[in-house]
């Protein structure tokens, strides 16, 4: 009986002791009950208790977020440096990942949340981030080289049209400079990378690049003037020969036009720069002109360069209208003098004085040394139908109607529908439909 009473008293003492401990601040929990959750602190920040109800410090990964808690159990927000690495947390404490725009700048955070700096190869392209992590846009000098980054951030490659001009960036983002042989042609880039268009002065001479940046070769019309560039693109000056055509390229490279005095001699050039020998009462045959005549038909002679075109024109004309007479072509100084004297005498035989006869003769016969026939480039072809056909088609063979109707005051010769002068198709086709005689076309009036 006494032993049983002692056991009961001992049990009561234990229960009273436990009760006293509980009232002293001790709590007892079931270890299998989840006590995790958020707690709003007095300063407005949050802390988090884990499964056992213990406040968390350091990293915490939940199903929908990753957060970080400082040593005071507070969840951090904004920029944070943790273990010498930079991170960013939103106002809700969530770790920033991937692209984030903050205060007007873009940043990139890796899958681990670490802020990326320097060069970064991303799916959208290659980017560069400053030491503060801000994404670079537009021009940036990096380790002594200049790069351009698109407004969206990727490093520029290939062609880029920028405010200062056009650039080409290689796969490393370096812009090209100097002469570059590209797939579609040669271009030139200045030291600052801008593609050249227009004129370029180099040590060996002048070059010209079109609006697409291609180096020009051959003939080019630039601001109404004609220039010639060799196969390397170098602008040419001085005399330039192309088959039967001669050009004079002035000091600035432009082809001479109109009347020009060169080394004491008078030359005439078309609006496109082709030299044409002009012979009339004011322009005798120049000393530099050389004859090289061959047989055109029967006993008629013609300058070698005009032989084949004249023969073809005659064949085609006769095939079209049936006949075409060949009256006259090349004449020597002696022959021209004899014609002038004979014609003058014929007029005198009608009762004219010598002066009257001479003046009448000059309406159709040129003074020796000023006759087109002495060039060996003209032919008098007869027949009404033939002349009509030739007036329409002579241009196709390189000939012009030398003395058209209504131009006597300029040419000094009345209309001669039979007189055709060879100038080459480059000139004849350009003159066609202009309504100009040769003097007008060459700027000699």
Name each model feature, range by range:
Residues 2-275, 308, 392:
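Extracellular adhesion/carbohydrate-binding repeat motifs centered on closely spaced tryptophans
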Residues 10, 32, 263-265, 270-445:
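Extracytoplasmic cell-surface/polysaccharide-interacting catalytic and binding patches
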């Amino acid at each position: 009986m006494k032993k049983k009473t002692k056991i009961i008293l001992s049990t009561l003492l234990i229960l009273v002791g436990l009760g006293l401990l509980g009232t002293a601040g001790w709590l007892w929990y079931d270890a299998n009950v989840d006590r995790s959750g958020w707690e709003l602190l007095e300063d407005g920040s949050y802390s988090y208790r884990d499964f056992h109800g213990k406040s968390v410090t350091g990293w915490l990964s939940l199903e929908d977020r990753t957060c970080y808690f400082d040593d005071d159990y507070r969840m951090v927000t904004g920029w944070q440096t943790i273990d010498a690495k930079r991170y960013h947390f939103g106002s809700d404490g969530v770790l920033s990942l991937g692209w984030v725009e903050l205060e007007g700048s873009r940043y990139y955070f890796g899958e681990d949340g670490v802020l990326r700096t320097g060069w970064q190869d991303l799916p959208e392209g290659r980017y560069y981030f400053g030491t503060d992590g801000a994404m670079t846009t537009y021009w940036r000098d990096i380790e002594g080289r200049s790069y351009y980054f698109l407004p969206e951030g990727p490093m520029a490659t290939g062609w880029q049209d920028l405010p200062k001009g056009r650039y080409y960036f290689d796969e490393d983002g370096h812009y090209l400079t100097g002469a570059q042989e590209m797939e579609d042609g040669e271009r030139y880039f200045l030291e600052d990378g801008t593609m050249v268009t227009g004129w370029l002065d180099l040590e060996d001479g002048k070059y010209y690049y079109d609006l697409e940046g291609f180096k020009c070769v051959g003939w080019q019309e630039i601001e109404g003037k004609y220039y010639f560039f060799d196969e390397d693109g170098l602008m040419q000056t001085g005399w330039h020969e192309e088959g039967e055509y001669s050009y004079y390229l002035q000091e600035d490279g432009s082809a001479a036009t109109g009347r020009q005095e060169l080394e004491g001699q008078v030359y005439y050039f078309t609006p496109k720069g082709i030299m044409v020998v002009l012979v009339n009462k004011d322009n005798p045959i120049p000393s530099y002109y050389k004859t090289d005549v061959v047989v055109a038909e029967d006993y008629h002679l013609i300058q070698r360069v005009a032989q084949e075109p004249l023969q073809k024109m005659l064949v085609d004309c006769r095939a079209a209208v049936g006949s075409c007479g060949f009256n006259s072509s090349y004449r020597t100084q002696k022959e021209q003098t004899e014609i002038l004297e004979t014609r003058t005498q014929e007029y005198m035989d009608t009762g004219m004085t010598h002066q009257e006869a001479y003046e009448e003769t000059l309406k159709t016969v040129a003074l020796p040394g000023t006759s087109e026939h002495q060039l060996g480039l003209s032919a008098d072809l007869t027949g009404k139908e033939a002349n009509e056909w030739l007036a329409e088609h002579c241009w196709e063979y390189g000939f012009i109607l030398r003395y058209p109707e209504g131009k006597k005051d300029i040419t000094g010769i009345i209309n001669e529908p039979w007189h055709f002068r060879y100038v080459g198709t480059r000139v004849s086709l350009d003159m066609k439909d202009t309504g100009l005689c040769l003097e007008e076309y060459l700027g000699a009036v």
